[in-house]
Amino acid sequence: MSMQDPISDMLTRVRNGQAANKVAVKMPSSKLKVAIAALLKAEGYIVDFAVEGEAKPELEVTLKYFQAKPVIEQLKRVSRPGLRVYKKKDELPSVMGGLGIAIVSTSKGLMSDRAARKAGLGGEIICYVA
């Protein structure tokens, strides 16, 4: 059976891994998933990530905890295959009053809502992270 929404699957694996206090979670890899993991690492939400394997590459995400609690409190998919959500640069949302980030897919690649606002770019809102 093919996967309908691989990004939702990735976010769910991270959420479930943190709920079960796992050190790391593995999932099938893709360029978009690696870009999301790189953004989460740059923003400090995960410790690290690595792509393993040649024929069927797997993405391993090392989860981050602070005082035995997950760093990521909320991980919510916004734009999905059945309902795409696009926002102009002036309409980009602020997650939790600026404490969280919205991951935005722009013409210049994936970036946080702050970086997209600074670059003057709008795009597809992939997910909210807080």
From Swiss-Prot:
Alphabetical list of InterPro entries matching this protein: Ribosomal_uS8, Ribosomal_uS8_CS, Ribosomal_uS8_sf
Keywords: Ribonucleoprotein, Ribosomal protein, RNA-binding, rRNA-binding
One annotated Gene Ontology cellular component of this protein: ribosome
Domain of life, source organism: Bacteria
GO terms, biological process: translation
A Pfam family reported for this protein in Swiss-Prot or TrEMBL: Ribosomal_S8
Keyword rRNA-binding: yes
Cleavable signal peptide: none
The keyword Cytoplasm appears for this protein: no
SUPFAM superfamilies: Ribosomal protein S8 (SSF56047)
Gene Ontology MF term list: rRNA binding; structural constituent of ribosome
Subunit structure as annotated in this protein's UniProt entry: Part of the 30S ribosomal subunit. Contacts proteins S5 and S12.
PANTHER family noted in UniProt: 40S RIBOSOMAL PROTEIN S15A (PTHR11758)
Family membership: Belongs to the universal ribosomal protein uS8 family.
Role this protein plays: One of the primary rRNA binding proteins, it binds directly to 16S rRNA central domain where it helps coordinate assembly of the platform of the 30S subunit.
Protein name: Small ribosomal subunit protein uS8
Source species: Vibrio parahaemolyticus serotype O3:K6 (strain RIMD 2210633)
